[in-house]
Each structure stands twice: as C-alpha cells, then as structure tokens.
Design a protein with these regions (language model features):
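Hydrophobic beta-strand core positions in alpha/beta domains
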Residues: 57-59, 91-93, 137-138
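Short extracytoplasmic/periplasmic juxtamembrane "stem" segments immediately C-terminal to an N-terminal membrane anchor
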Residues: 36-54
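Thiol/disulfide oxidoreductase modules built on the thioredoxin-like
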Residues: 104-112, 119-164
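Structural microenvironment flanking redox-active thiols in thiol-disulfide oxidoreductases
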Residues: 69-109, 119-125
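N-terminal targeting signals for export/organelle localization
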Residues: 1-39, 169
Length: 169
C-alpha cells in the first residue's frame, strides 16, 4: 500500500467515525415511554398505551416527600390549566408510601387527576429505576418521553414545553 492510499484509508475511517458520532450526538434524544400498568386509587388501571394522543405528566411522588407535597398545588394548577386542551397527569405514589396515606392525601387535597399506587415498585423500575422523589416525566402525544425533571420542575419552563407539545399533531 502506498503512503497516499494509507492516508486515504485513514481519512475515510475518520470520516465514518465522525459521521456516526454526529448521528448519535444529534439524535432527537426521545425515548418511548415504557410499557406500564398504573393501578389507580379506585381499583381501575391505565396503561402507557392509553396515554397516546395526549400530552401527559407522569409524576413519581410520596406523601413523606416535602418537595412533592410543596409542588402538588402547582401540579394541580398545571393540570387544571391544560387538561381541557388535551393534557393529562398521573401521580404515581412510590412503593414505600402507605396506601392509606396516599388515599387520604388525594381525597383531602381533592387531586383532580389520576393517582396510582406502585405497590410493587414495578412502575418505578420500568421508568428508569426511579428512586428520588419527585421525579417527573413529560410524555408527548406519540408516547415519547421528551423531558425528565428530578426535583421540582421549573414550572414556567414546564408550561412552555406543555404548550409547545399541545400544538403538535
């Protein structure tokens, strides 16, 4: 092999590596929401597949989490503001949260959205081994996770994102 052909080969290989790297770097970054079955307080259930067609906030929380309790009025306000436009919320209580506490909290605060109890921890595992609360996912109409917040979201940013997603087909 001549020096020129070796250089050409190395240049072609480097170009291929850069192209693959660029493809990975510029990929949309969205992932499909995991298949999950949410067991709601009334005993009914909802699946991830049923979320399609609506922008949905999936909020992992606990009654013992100070930040979760503090952000809940903002989650309620967000739900009330955007629900008529095709927005939904599922609040998933962590497996360590006593069901009686979750039911009491949901009833006394009159939570207007679906509240699920993750008794086995299967939902938290499916959504990326959620351990910290609050952890909140925003799912678009196609069932793709477009944003994950750990801790209380910046609600102004969240509202802009929801408004943008609601406009999408």
């Amino acid at each position: 092999m001549t020096l020129l052909s070796k250089r050409s080969l190395y240049l072609a290989a480097a170009t291929a590596v850069l192209a693959v790297g660029a493809l990975v770097f510029f990929k949309s970054g969205t992932e499909i929401a995991p298949e999950s079955k949410f067991v709601l307080l009334d005993g009914s259930s909802k699946t991830t597949a049923e979320l399609k067609g609506r922008v949905t906030l999936v909020n992992f929380w606990a009654t013992s989490c100070v930040t979760c309790v503090a952000e809940m009025p903002k989650i309620i306000a967000t739900y009330n503001k955007y629900h008529p436009q095709g927005f939904d919320t599922i609040a998933v209580a962590m497996s360590y949260d006593p069901p009686a506490y979750v039911v009491n909290y949901a009833q006394t605060r009159q939570l207007p959205f679906n509240v699920a109890i993750d008794n086995t921890g299967a939902v938290a595992r499916a959504w990326g081994e959620v351990k910290l609360t609050p952890t909140t996912y925003v799912v678009n109409k196609r069932g793709e996770i477009v944003k994950r917040f750990v801790g209380e979201p910046d609600f102004a940013e969240l509202h802009k994102l929801i408004e943008s997603l609601l406009k999408q087909v």
